[in-house]
């Protein structure tokens, strides 16, 4: 599949629904009447104070399965600890409307980062989460923008961590977080600070599929390098990726790693392991990659460094 889809530049929109569409949100909820009661003057004040002191506006990178994720990882790795203090700074009285709009977008970005951090904790301890919890613990004065914030956070959990946010009680707005495609590779995370790795595993399985179910090792590393994952280099989420692919996932039977018959010097290749065959299917992996390829990390690309900041503060 093509990895060279190009993303348009994102433009601010006054309409909330249109704004959500511009952000590429999927499955966002409609705001309730109670949420819409927040006055525009109160919102404006909170938005200006929360978002003041933001860095330069984000750029619109190219989209695509591997290239989209590479944008997330690259920007995440550039996290600036100073960004966490933005909410305490006061805006200048001479800020023009365009700058105020940008600062508001940055304020929403910070809320998305906070919500991702909150959802990660719920996923690790295997607890459900309700809309009421999210509003009280994270969203707070931004209740009218819950659909945008929740939609973007859910997308982040799915694309970066391979974790689906599923509604289990529509009446009570209750959700559970589960590993994508029925995989159990993240079942032992516990209440620590380990990051879910299912998304990376799914991409590796997908690369194997594109090579007639048997991918040379160098092809795997070339594909992962587009995402900022390099052999022998410690990764912020996955640790040392070579160990993860050639030892951990091999021992768990998600991957098979073997020498190419007759190769001299020795070359190695990856295949699906028995557990991958048991827990998921070719069709599910292909559909997941199609979903990744449709994502466009536009408008809030620097969100991902903010989420890392939330994680670092929690350590």
Swiss-Prot record:
Compositionally skewed regions (Low complexity) per UniProt: 50-67
Alphabetical keyword list: Tumor antigen
GO cellular component, one term: nucleus
Organs and tissues of expression: Expressed in many tumors of several types, such as melanoma, head and neck squamous cell carcinoma, lung carcinoma and breast carcinoma, but not in normal tissues except for testes and placenta.
Superkingdom per UniProt: Eukaryota
Compositional bias ranges of the Basic and acidic residues kind: 1-13
One annotated GO molecular function: histone deacetylase binding
Biological process, per Gene Ontology: negative regulation of transcription by RNA polymerase II
Ranges that cross the membrane: none
Disordered: annotated span: 1-67
Alphabetized Pfam families for the sequence: MAGE (PF01454), MAGE_N (PF12440)
Domain annotation MAGE: ranges: 108-307
Function statement: Not known, though may play a role in embryonal development and tumor transformation or aspects of tumor progression.
PANTHER family: MELANOMA-ASSOCIATED ANTIGEN 9 (PTHR11736:SF62), MELANOMA-ASSOCIATED ANTIGEN MAGE ANTIGEN (PTHR11736)
Protein's name in the database: Melanoma-associated antigen 9
Natural source organism: Homo sapiens (Human)
Gene this protein is translated from: MAGEA9
